[in-house]
């Protein structure tokens, strides 16, 4: 036996779930993903999403509506008469007609332990807040923002130096397995739903460019969490005067270090920076237009002495 599934997703994060559902023998009757976006060096090429590309390689039909405001789009969705829709990082709001457009509704894979970190950036926000655990939850979607009843939960530890990119890759695999397991249970009519708790609700707002600059006038642990929560994208950054001109430098890796001093000042010549309390060691950096470098390689091209100020 197998389910007929409409899959809805867009980024790389969604792809393992799609592949695992196909491997499990389910019939993917349609794949919905966001429309191709301008890309390439000059932005002249239209680039298909990772899910779009994966679906085509799997020989699956792909649909790319801008939204579901058009009645024709909603009718086409319902016409598939699918058993269920699986939604993983699709990125579009789903109206009630879509939420109720399959026999069993829509099940979403969300990268947090709900109700903590509902919203757009749960992976980054969990690390930036210093959480030591997070997870993947499969929930049945309702009209609210990540408020649906939980069908399945898988917890994942967040290591002290783990970056958002590393956590993303871990949750991507955990989430795929969780959704595949949930679909097996759904097929067997053995997928009980548990309403989310009413306490502990936090919202994971989309990362704003204005908050990516590093503020060394914060405690070292907060600075460290800020750096790893934004690595590798969009990247936390500071300004450094190079050749008489301020240049933006992204920090893609850090660790807590010993030391005290003026916030933003290098305490050593190997990139230990003083914070409001304590210090951080910058371990991976990237200058504008350059490639990411280990601290030792960065310093070969840009030597920095103790006492240098980072702002």
Curated annotation (Swiss-Prot):
It holds the Pfam family Formyl_trans_N. GO terms for molecular function: methionyl-tRNA formyltransferase activity. (6S)-5,6,7,8-tetrahydrofolate binds at residues 112-115. InterPro entries: Fmt (IPR005794), Formyl_trans_C (IPR005793), Formyl_transf_N (IPR002376), Formyl_transf_N_sf (IPR036477), Formyl_transferase-like_C_sf (IPR011034), GART_AS (IPR001555), Met-tRNA-FMT_C (IPR044135), Met-tRNA-FMT_N (IPR041711). GO terms for cellular component: cytosol. SUPFAM superfamilies: FMT C-terminal domain-like (SSF50486), Formyltransferase (SSF53328). Its EC number is 2.1.2.9. Keywords: Protein biosynthesis, Transferase. It catalyses: L-methionyl-tRNA(fMet) + (6R)-10-formyltetrahydrofolate = N-formyl-L-methionyl-tRNA(fMet) + (6S)-5,6,7,8-tetrahydrofolate + H(+). Belongs to the Fmt family. Attaches a formyl group to the free amino group of methionyl-tRNA(fMet). The formyl group appears to play a dual role in the initiator identity of N-formylmethionyl-tRNA by promoting its recognition by IF2 and preventing the misappropriation of this tRNA by the elongation apparatus. This is Methionyl-tRNA formyltransferase. It comes from Rhizobium etli (strain CIAT 652). The lineage of its organism: Bacteria, Pseudomonadati, Pseudomonadota, Alphaproteobacteria, Hyphomicrobiales. The gene is fmt.
């Amino acid at each position: 036996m197998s389910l007929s599934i409409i899959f809805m997703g867009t980024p790389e994060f969604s792809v393992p779930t799609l592949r695992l559902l196909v491997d499990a023998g389910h019939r993917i009757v349609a794949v919905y993903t966001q429309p191709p976006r301008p890309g390439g060096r000059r932005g002249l090429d239209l680039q298909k999403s990772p899910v779009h590309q994966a679906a085509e390689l799997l020989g699956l039909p792909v649909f790319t509506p801008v939204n579901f405001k058009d009645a024709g789009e909603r009718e086409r969705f319902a016409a598939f008469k699918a058993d269920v829709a699986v939604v993983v990082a699709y990125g579009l709001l789903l109206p009630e007609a879509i939420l109720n457009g399959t026999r069993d509704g829509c099940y979403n894979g969300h990268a947090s332990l709900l109700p903590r970190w509902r919203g757009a950036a749960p992976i980054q926000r969990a690390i930036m807040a210093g959480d030591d655990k997070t997870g993947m939850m499969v929930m049945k979607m309702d009209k609210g923002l990540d408020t649906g009843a939980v069908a399945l939960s898988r917890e994942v530890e967040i290591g002290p130096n783990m970056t958002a990119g590393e956590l993303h890759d871990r949750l991507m695999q955990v989430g795929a397995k969780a959704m595949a397991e949930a679909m097996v249970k759904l097929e067997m009519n053995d997928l009980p739903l548990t309403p989310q708790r009413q306490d502990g609700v936090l919202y994971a707002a989309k990362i704003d460019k204005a908050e990516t600059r590093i503020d060394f006038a914060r405690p070292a642990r907060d600075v460290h969490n800020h750096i790893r929560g934004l690595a590798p994208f969009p990247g936390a950054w500071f300004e450094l005067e190079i050749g008489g001109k301020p240049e933006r430098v992204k920090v893609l890796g850090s660790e807590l270090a010993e030391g005290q001093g003026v916030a933003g000042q290098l305490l050593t010549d190997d990139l230990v920076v003083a914070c409001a309390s304590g210090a951080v060691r910058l371990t991976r950096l990237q200058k504008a237009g350059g490639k990411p470098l280990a601290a030792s390689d960065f310093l070969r091209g840009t030597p920095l002495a103790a006492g240098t100020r980072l702002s």
